[in-house]
Amino acid sequence: MKREFSLENTRNIGIMAHIDAGKTTTTERILYYTGKIHKIGETHEGASQMDWMEQEQERGITITSAATTAQWAGHRVNIIDTPGHVDFTVEVERSLRVLDGAVTVLDAQSGVEPQTETVWRQATTYGVPRIVFINKMDKTGADFLYSVGTLHDRLQANAHPIQLPIGAEDQFSAIIDLVEMKATFYGDEKGTAVTEGEIPEEYRAQAEEYREKLIDAVASVDEDIMEKYLEGEEITVAELKAAIRRATIAVEFYPVICGTAFKHKGVRPMLNAVIDYLPSPVDVPAIKGTSVDGDEELERKSSDDEPFSALAFKVMTDPFVGKLTFFRVYSGTLDSGSYVQNSSKGKRERVGRILQMHANSREEISKVFAGDIAAAVGLKDTTTGDTLCDEKNLVILESMEFPEPVISLSVEPKSKADQDKMGQALQKLQEEDPTFRAHTDTETGQTIISGMGELHLDILVDRMRREFKVEANVGAPMVSYRETFRSSAKVQGKFTRQSGGRGQYGDVTIEFSPNEEGKGFEFENAIVGGVIPREYIPAVEAGLRDSLDRGVVAGYPLIDIKAKLVFGSYHDVDSNEMAFKIAASMALKEASKQCDAVILEPMMKVEVVIPEEYLGDIMGNITSRRGRVEGMDARGNSQVVRAMVPLAEMFGYATTLRSATQGRGVFSMTFDHYEEVPKSIAAEIIKKNKGE
């Protein structure tokens, strides 16, 4: 099988946004224009091509990122549609890791919204070049320049229009191209009666002003244009395009375009912008990795001639073919039926079949090349974030980091038959989703599942019922609290047992202290002179790690602390690993009395959008939920309240908001950080956990 499109003519892009900005509809239109779909599915009718799980079609939201291949202007475009709902952050995180560029979709009425900020931050972390598509220009209250302003104010982004709309709301009828200085007029709803022509006289001055601003913004990050600009030379269309491309790929500039995907306006120019300004796999730096032992830094260039390397970014259970592993090829080629090494797990895997995906229909292919995104059937041990590579040229590519779950609930199978099936279902769902955890509570024997939010767990329980036919009773949601130390102490833990014959002996002195937020647990061995033999040191660390999960105040995991092993003693005959493990956990227990142990709770960044008349009530309600109002903005006729509120106080908020605003208020929340729980509430939590 020969390569169909050159690497230079390949684009791997994601479509990302806040919920309801119109991402899935935008992707649908792209597929329609690139000839992949003949009839278009509307999201609100539950017939969209990209949203193929039953729950997605019922709820009209996108949960899993479907990967699709399309063709446009002699290029292959691989598109990943990512969910905008905050509970599915992990889907966005893993798709961004394997993309070369992205289209950020904004709602023209709202501009940048909370989830846009989250996704934008994630894309910046991974250095992903972006184009911004301001969608829904036909919506009441649509305001293009306001939306562009929110990119500057909320994201501090160097984003500038390369198009201007003619008209807005129901008068939106044409788009001005500021690079080529021409206009595209739309004659009908389907976007088929399209004509190109001169910019209407009454819009000419505005277009010239914004073209000048565009050149000015590009010149500030591109020396070639800067020189010509300062010398007053004419900048040609080709030079301006090339400079915008360079600055966009360098993640120093973000071109802004507009349209309304639902009415087919602005979709073709968007596809052209993807080709013109977003990078091909050869325009982005070679991917970095390490040798298997971690000692040597390696890199893999985007080329078919390099050894094969790929990153698995999603695992799914498919009803027809079983386990599907989506992967992005960074270098080399791979034939179906061949063997690869999973270097992250040290396992050899056979790639049974390779499928090219189109939302949820698929086409079998015999070979993949550098830059491709495809799905493999037959991989047994591979999970999200694993590296697959050539067996003779091992490399481990940088993996992904996933946030910790913040909310839990108990699930109990309704019958014995459900119990066995539930175990398998939970295992499969955990393989698919790294932010979903399931464990058995050792004290109550209940199965506890944890995830990123109520909707996240709701959908997973729903999938257990539909896909795995497991009926279960679900408990009320619980907050995932954490514990930490606020002060330092040096403590001893000594475990001795003499019971005839060989005894047990372990003795450690450990300095415990608070660590920086987000740094987790750090262990340092500062033993000198062999007072504890080297072979027992790992047992001390293991004993501490085991005890951390059980907590010291109310049974919640202990985070962000340092433990420095400074002294101890051992017995030639009686000492063993178990004794040192127990001694370490005794030291931690002692430290909890001296280190000012506290309970931490997840704090959520909440944004509430409400009509002005409800402002007082809503702010009062936020304060009554122990929230702090951090700012307010006017957005059209609405007020936007930004606040930091404990997750524990946000359960059922959707219902409260709905009744307080007669259904006119909306809110969104994202996890922000952990904060100490007030003493009175901590006392209640401890009491409840001890069953008093």
Curated annotation (Swiss-Prot):
Main location (coarse class): cytoplasm
One cellular-component annotation, GO: cytoplasm
PROSITE patterns: G_TR_1 (PS00301), G_TR_2 (PS51722)
CDD domains: EF-G, EFG_III, EFG_mtEFG1_IV, EFG_mtEFG_C, EFG_mtEFG_II
Residues given in the record as GTP binding sites: 17-24, 81-85, 135-138
GO biological process per UniProt: ribosome disassembly
Gene Ontology terms, MF aspect: GTP binding; GTPase activity; translation elongation factor activity
Record-linked SUPFAM superfamilies: EF-G C-terminal domain-like, P-loop containing nucleoside triphosphate hydrolases, Ribosomal protein S5 domain 2-like, Translation proteins
Annotated ranges, domain tr-type G: 8-282
Keyword annotations of the record: Cytoplasm, Elongation factor, GTP-binding, Nucleotide-binding, Protein biosynthesis
Subcellular location: Cytoplasm
HAMAP family referenced in this protein's UniProt entry, alphabetically: EF_G_EF_2_B (MF_00054_B)
Function: Catalyzes the GTP-dependent ribosomal translocation step during translation elongation. During this step, the ribosome changes from the pre-translocational (PRE) to the post-translocational (POST) state as the newly formed A-site-bound peptidyl-tRNA and P-site-bound deacylated tRNA move to the P and E sites, respectively. Catalyzes the coordinated movement of the two tRNA molecules, the mRNA and conformational changes in the ribosome.
Family: Belongs to the TRAFAC class translation factor GTPase superfamily. Classic translation factor GTPase family. EF-G/EF-2 subfamily.
The protein, known as: Elongation factor G
Name of the encoding gene: fusA
